[in-house]
Amino acid sequence: MRKINLLDLETTNKIAAGEVIERPFSVVKELVENSIDAGAKNITIEIEDGGQKLIKIIDDGEGIYPIDIKNAFLPHATSKINSIEDIYKISTMGFRGEALASISSVSKTKLKSRVDSYNFGKEIYIEGGKIEYLKDTGCNVGTTIEVSDLFYNVPARLKFLKSARSDSSAISDIVNRFILAHPDISFNLINKGKQSIKSYGTGNLKDSIRCVYNKTISENLINFENHKDIISVYGFIGKPEISRKSRTNQSIFVNKRYVKSKFITAAVENAFKSFLTVNSYPFFVIFIDIFPEYIDVNVHPTKSEVKFKDERAMFKTIFDAVHEAIKGELKESFTNFFNKEDINIYDSEKSIAETIKPGKEEVQIPIDLNSNNKIDIFGNNINKLPNNTELLKNIDIKEKNILENNDNFYTSNQNEIYYTNKNDKCLNSCNKDDYSKIEKPLQKDNKNLDNLYLNEHNTNSSSINIKENKPNNFYVDMKIIGQFNNTYILIEKDKELYIIDQHAAHEKVLFEKFKSEIEKGYVVSQILLSPVVIELSEDEFNIYEENKDIFKNSGFSVEAFGECTINIKEVPLILGKPNVENLFMDILYNLKNMKSKETSTIKYNAIATLACKSAVKANDNLKEEEIKKLIEDMLILNNPYTCPHGRPTMIKFTLKDLEKKFKRIQ
């Protein structure tokens, strides 16, 4: 083993500088933070050659006392803390006392500063960490510091610097973050003698956003806030139309400090997930004000990361604030259309016997897969029963003797499906013989559920709570104009034109219904009379094995059927009559693409795929009753405004919008 050497001060300072000072923008960041801590209200940053040749910071802060000028450049010399305990209640940008020592050790640094109580200031010049002179000088109150020839004495670091244009861009970015974090401070960035960025310190965050970005972004913002005992979360999030394909327009500030945090970003994006298209990222500026003792800012050399005491609570606070703000904004946009006062939602207690014709012993609901009628698209058959999912969930139709007692039915109706609910056994106390005998299947031309029977003796004492949604005054002033291209539904209401994407709207309805069933454990399945056998590759089979619980919880009954082969026996009822193999493989491929993501994200996308594949498609002709049913289903959703993939379900044109298009008004 080699001999252990004690490094000299110059070497240790250069090594320390390598951690704190990565590039010229790091110098700007550290020096501007010092100016902010000094209470400056006007800060000017001048750079040349991307900061490699010159960085000059001028502020009107409190300044440095003459006696402290030399000490300011010593390692770990700071006015911010006195002991280790102070780190955990720090409220300033800087606290380590490393910045000036690190910067001066790898550059030529000149500093002039004056406090208000002195008639003159002090000037110090340091080259490569060595003080060349210290003298009195005349200057304004505040501090001016010039850093030139950065890394001139560290050739190895110098040759790894990026181009001047790249460094200029990085400096512009960090200055923009300062403008957002401190709307009450005026910042002025001058690059090669020309003004590059200018803010006016109005104290208005929207003014800062407009300065940093543009008018379009500043006019498409949604305000959000959530205040708790120890934390306040507030800021702006952009409307979906200003989302981008990257996260460059996202800013997080914790106690005014610009940081990067994956879990905070995830909280905002998850709250925005259902409102954005795939692979789009929202614009946001989020501020988190929290008591210093609940965070640790001393976890990264550049202080660009923070650690929270309770990340779970933080995630929920951020998610709730953003999600409620977005929902509120969308609701306001469609207030006239989604007027909840027009919908009378009431609870009624009805016995099953009152809902279903009594007198028979059979319970049977087969579906003809060969039928071309869209009987299950909007529940025109099934939903004649109030909330039939709630009804069916209490009926276990999957008894072994269903098929055993009716061999003729099994052989003659290969394209029919049975409904089953695997999660609820409320009728187990009844005698199975009372409801498991099958007399005759429903005929293919049946248009309702009148042949769904229960023995009267078994149902007289049974009742369930049924929640119905009855239109009250909604259709009074609504006019269904029709379909455009059998894809878009046109509706007139209160002198406004609404255009609904029928696929996106129905997809959202199915998604919410299916998601609710999974969350409550009420997934109703259909028994396939002809099980679907699928051969998978080894990779596909492994993906299925890793995620088979997702399929099970979603209403699929899948069994291994030999090596790399599966047998699908049941699919979710809500899907109607899907192409089982295509649907299964689509979900499998999505799971493969998302294998590194959170379980909740995988489940969300799996449900979205199910809904997308089962929804009415573009170019499907809909009857007026089907359109009305779709609108009714949308009305009871918390968020009917976007499909699961983030596309809008509808757009609105006011009379004023149309008259502007036709130049009737200006």
Swiss-Prot record:
A GO term for molecular function: mismatched DNA binding
Organism domain of life: Bacteria
Keywords: DNA damage, DNA repair
Listed GO CC annotations: mismatch repair complex
Family to which the UniProt record says this protein belongs: Belongs to the DNA mismatch repair MutL/HexB family.
GO BP annotation list: mismatch repair
Record Pfam families: DNA_mis_repair, HATPase_c_3, MutL_C
Function: This protein is involved in the repair of mismatches in DNA. It is required for dam-dependent methyl-directed DNA mismatch repair. May act as a 'molecular matchmaker', a protein that promotes the formation of a stable complex between two or more DNA-binding proteins in an ATP-dependent manner without itself being part of a final effector complex.
Species, as recorded: Clostridium botulinum (strain 657 / Type Ba4)
Family annotation (SMART domains): DNA_mis_repair, MutL_C
InterPro entries: DNA_mismatch_repair_CS, DNA_mismatch_repair_MutL, DNA_mismatch_S5_2-like, HATPase_C_sf, MutL/Mlh/PMS, MutL/Mlh/Pms-like, MutL_C, MutL_C_dimsub
Name used for this protein in its record: DNA mismatch repair protein MutL
The keyword DNA damage belongs to this UniProt entry's keyword annotation: yes
PROSITE patterns xrefs: DNA_MISMATCH_REPAIR_1 (PS00058)
